[in-house]
Amino acid sequence: MNHLEIEYKTLLTKDEYNRLAMLFSHVTPVTQTNYYIDTIQGDMKSKKLYLRIRTLPTHGELTLKIPEKVGNMEYNVTMDCAEAKAMTKSLDFPDCQIKSILLERGVTLEDLTILGHLTTTRREYQTNIGLMALDVNVYADKKDYELELEVLDAEKGKDDFDAFLKENNINFKYAKSKVARFVATLKRDKD
């Protein structure tokens, strides 16, 4: 499945997270783990390609994100839990559109490795302004809190997100993507 992902996000303080958690109390949290993939040299990042395997309780997903003028084009392959778990060990790519795109873009599949993982406990539901997710993320020695809103219309979505934050007394705090925050911990560890 492919789609254009347009989302807005903000980091949250623990207090802001706890306040919003009350709005999401009707939603059962789901724990998912993202395994981030690149070469040791960062070839994927230099080509502006972002690749992950996500494991969830009921299935797994292989996802490739490619930045567009607005949002990211997202390519997804759904797999069962066993396939996803096996892929986190072997990185043996199924024949799929993602594999084809990587090869077309000159990525040497044998050089890819899993850099590490980030685990998210997510409460997600469809609101009247878009698909909203309240996340707790744990990676390396860090824990952060985040609110995301996925929308179809970039301009209206931005206005709706800003209004939601104001209505709920949330101060906007710029949030890099999860993969960027994760990779920043790798760079810090090297210093």
Residue ranges and their predicted role:
Residues 1-191:
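Phosphate-end processing signature that detects enzymes handling 5′-triphosphorylated RNA
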